[in-house]
Each structure stands twice: as C-alpha cells, then as structure tokens.
Amino acid sequence: MEGILVIAHGSRAKETEATLDTVLSMVKAKLPDSVIECAFMEFSDRTVEKGVSALAAKGVTEIKVVPYFLFMGIHLKEDIPSLAATCAASFPDIKITMGEPLGADERLADILVDRIKG
C-alpha cells in the first residue's frame, strides 16, 4: 500500500498548518483510497519523521514524498532528501521516493490569473 507524505515549509503563523490541512482534505476527497499525512520543515512539531512514522503505523509499504513547494530550493535539494534517507534507514521495509515541487505549471498560472482578475 502506498502512502503519501506532503511536506510544506512551515511558518511561525500557525494558521498555515490549518491551510495545508484544508488542502489535504480536498486531496483526500479526490483520492479517497490514499493514505496521506503532512509534515513541515520548520516551526512545527509535525515533522517529516513523525509523518513517516504515522504512515508506517498505517501499514504502508511505499511512501511518495510530495513537496508542497513552488521552487527547487535548499530544502528540496538537500534537507528533504537527507531526512528521507534517515527515515528510510529507520524503516528499511518501506520504499521512499521523492516527487517534484509544484514548479512552473499551467494550472498555477490559471490560479494566478484568477487572483489577478479577482
């Protein structure tokens, strides 16, 4: 069974966690058979390690790490792969793979246009 770990940056503003929870509720509605957890890189106790542990406790055999980031910055180039490797060592029976950041995507451009036109 595949699990999904969505990782966001995190913020001192705690409402950002609620925003991601709302987005993940929308995702879960579209992928009802998926096992999804989220984690934050900073300013939260919802760490990558805790997210992987939660998925492992639910019996997943694979985890796809999906970054909720726009750009390929230092967290995506170094920090998240390092954390994923540490988690993989702790859970050797679980295959962990990395997804891509949101990046340059036509759908994001559409959202931006909607916001501009308001």
Set out the residue ranges of the language-model regions.
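Active-site-proximal alpha-helix that buttresses catalytic centers in soluble enzyme cores
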Residues: M1-G118
